[in-house]
Amino acid sequence: MFYVKFDELITLKNKKISELNDNLYVAKKDQEKLGKLEKEYASTISVFLESTENNSKTLEKTITEAGLDPNELVKKSYGDTPRGGAFIPETDEKRNELTVQNKLQKLEALQNIVYSIPLVAPLDYYWVSSNYGRRKDPINGKYATHYGIDLVAQTSTIIMATAGGIVTATGKRANYGKMVEIDHGYGLKTRYGHLHKINKKKGEMVDFREEIGRLGSSGRVTGPHLHYEVLYDYKAQNPAKFINAGKNVFNNK
């Protein structure tokens, strides 16, 4: 028969209690560390989301100042993306993950949009001889709508693309003379008229501020200048608004 002395039982019990207390102490410390990590994580996520939101607001402000609707453009950037998948109940962790993902996705979309908007002037040094809107025609003296702005500089001054895109038209056109048209995506196009020389062909890709031609006096003009247009969804926009809005992003003239 196996016997255990009473004092040995007490010793064994005290040992187990001590081990249990040690384990509880370690568990408590681990819990404190976990709580601290969770707070640090929450703080980091909060700071990150605030920074992302501020950057998005800055870009939205620039787009709005150009006369465009940032929400409309963001929707265009997403397109008709197919959707589906299994239903997974939402948790706090998953909610945070989705919030971060959505904020980042929107910021990325806004950045791509701003890169595609013509926010600079097509030449470095110029003066404006005709603004956008109603004006007296310089040739026949009758009032009509001017769908762009006229930028005066010396003949053969370099003309640059005001945003990256693809050349959709080149050559001679009535009233424009020698012209270049660029599609920047999102429904945005720019036109450059009265050129002396065209350096690009239809279908070519162009980068931001890449030379596309030289200033001239071709077409219906009274002297050398660039007729510059911005279109959104085929409707003429005021190019000056885009250039002024771009001063928040670029060091414009």
Question: What would you call each of these model-derived segments?
Answer:
Residues 115-253:
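Catalytic cores of peptidoglycan-degrading enzymes
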